[in-house]
């Protein structure tokens, strides 16, 4: 995927902040500190387009990125972070739910899980919602460079079994921001949907 001009557009803290346009959008969803921002940066070949942090819960808004005036990447706040006040969690939940349920040009979702661990209950709830919505989805298991080659098949089976993916026509790929593995697969998932999008 060749990208010439990726640019940050806005950090949306409320529905009124969402940008108005007719391009397809691709949401990146996952729990806190799973590597959403790093995946976006790798995808667009920019180290600091999406802000990354070792501190979970850093992304507190929905961040919109315009890619070559062709489509948008949307970085959703991470879920499942314990050390956040309940009221803040509820606001994040309201914002995320409002975006996912009411964004007519949402063309696809990249659901991110950690390749090293069994998906959480929150991951399963999110995937169940995606299944019910019918929105095209790619499951990206990040940080695959941190597990051995020999354990990959076992981890893939664990992820697919936990998320009940056998009855789901979504795609799956391992991903590493460090090595670039999976970048081509994520890019193809997005571009195929851009080409078929009718807003």
Swiss-Prot record:
InterPro entries: G_ENGB_dom, GTP-bd, GTP-bd_ribosome_bio_YsxC, P-loop_NTPase. This is Probable GTP-binding protein EngB. The keyword Cell division applies. GTP binds at residues 30-37, 57-61, 75-78, 142-145, 175-177. PANTHER family: ENGB-TYPE G DOMAIN-CONTAINING PROTEIN (PTHR11649:SF13), MSS1/TRME-RELATED GTP-BINDING PROTEIN (PTHR11649). Residues 22-196 form the EngB-type G domain. GO terms for cellular component: cytosol. Necessary for normal cell division and for the maintenance of normal septation. It comes from the Bacteria. Belongs to the TRAFAC class TrmE-Era-EngA-EngB-Septin-like GTPase superfamily. EngB GTPase family.
